């Protein structure tokens, strides 16, 4: 298994992580949740670089375009409450993915 540290290079991800860690910003729950969602979007984008793709032909108004699309179905699963904002960030990119949730009773 390969581990990728996406926060090692300076990017907007580091800005959002810094805001999550800031005790003053943590008091703003809406901003906190939005930053978690943004981090989910960044993670989804980075993850998309490692997925398998297949070649397809798409009919456009101007003709046929040969391009690629994700080869396999995606299933997103998160732990209820703690992972909901992060899950939403992934759903913003993988909007046709199946969803699963884990909870404890």
Give short role names for the model-derived ranges.
Residues 1-105:
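PRPP-associated nucleotide enzymes
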């Amino acid at each position: 298994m390969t581990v990728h540290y996406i926060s090692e290079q300076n990017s907007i991800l580091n800005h959002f992580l810094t805001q999550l860690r800031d005790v003053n910003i943590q008091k703003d729950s809406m901003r906190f949740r939005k930053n978690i969602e943004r981090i989910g979007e960044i993670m989804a984008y980075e993850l998309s670089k490692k997925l398998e793709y297949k070649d397809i032909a798409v009919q456009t108004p101007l003709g046929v375009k040969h391009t690629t699309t994700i080869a396999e179905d995606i299933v997103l699963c998160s732990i209820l409450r703690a992972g909901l904002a992060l899950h939403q960030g992934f759903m913003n990119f993988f909007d046709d993915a199946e969803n699963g949730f884990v909870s404890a009773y």
